[in-house]
Amino acid sequence: MNQTTKLCAATTLALGTLIGATVVGTASPIHQEAQAATTPYYTYHGYIGHNANFIMDKHFINAIKYDNVTFNGIKLAKTNATKKVEKYDQTFKGVTAKGNEANQLQFIVKNNISLKDIQKAYGKDLKKENNKTKESDSGIFYYQHSKKSLGIWFVVDHNRVVEVTVGHTPYKTSK
């Protein structure tokens, strides 16, 4: 009788474990979550003046391509506004009433960034606007992935970048 009790107990335990494992296995749903693609972005805080090297950063260039650039809490976006705001050493144009979006950003470059530096960073996508100057190392150079995306314009004077504009509207000098 002792062996029969042990056999029944072992069978009950084995069956209980098998059924329990099966129930637990099917009770938890399988999650196959898709990872959302992250849109490239670039955020800048503070003064730019002597620290404009970020304009050659591949992450900044990629963020321009994807229209996802923010400076000092103001996102560059297509706006119909006309308000102009000075923040740190930057001029924002087309700032919305809430002050969180602007159509264009301009700043003066105070460190030595050369035409060759931006040509290396932007490659063959960097173009010269209208060839208004006969000098090859001066004029307005720009990069714009498509006509509907953000663009960046560089004012170059004798191989030196002196002013930068980032925005959706064509460049107009601040001078």
Swiss-Prot record:
Keyword Signal tagged: yes
Keywords of the record: Secreted, Signal
A GO cellular component annotation in the UniProt record: extracellular region
Subcellular location: Secreted
Protein's UniProt keywords contain Transferase: no
Leader peptide range in chain numbering: 1-36
Tree of life domain: Bacteria
Location (main, coarse): secreted
Protein family according to the UniProt entry: Belongs to the IsaB family.
NCBIfam families for this protein: IsaB_fam (NF047686)
Protein's recorded name: Immunodominant staphylococcal antigen B
Source organism of this protein record: Staphylococcus aureus (strain MRSA252)
The gene coding this protein: isaB
